[in-house]
Amino acid sequence: MEQKDVSLETQLPIRLDIAMYKKGLYRETDKMSDLICENYPMVLVMSRFGIALGFGEKSIGEVCRQNGVDANTFLTVVNFLTGEVQGLTDEVSNALSLETLIRYLHNAHDYFLAFRLPNMRRKLNEAISTCPEDVAFVIRRFFDEYAEEVNKHMTYEEKVVFPYVRDLLNGKASDKYNISIFRKRHEQIDQKLSDLKN
């Protein structure tokens, strides 16, 4: 069986399709307002890092420091989502704040489960409203099963994976869990998503 890479790319929510926006890496010295003006979907990313609007002309670095967010981690996520970073070097990976990244992923999970999935279901219901009832039922059931799988997966990450990573950060290794177990579970949700798309 082919081993999949469990990297930042596989852990972040779906990349933004923002090819029409500014190209080039964002840096700590760039203004946060420029980031938002040039890539307005980054407002969602900011909120997942716990950064609120109202920063005026401050730089990305200043805003991150004022909000207790590791600027390198914030910029890595931003530059990945804007398509400027395709993968991570060991140097960049080692400089990431895993605690900041976990907090971001936790907030992304909350957003996805509380807002995104219900909104997708509502739009799906609108789209299939003219379908024969038996077809609409099958589509709705498949979506609901998928949503339940996503919910289980994210709950698993919250209750098992994130505490495991935090324990590792605190020097506590586990003999009952490792990242290979996570990888296997993650592949299952990837397959379910692929089934839904097809």
Annotate the PLM regions:
Residues 2-198:
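Small-residue-biased structural context
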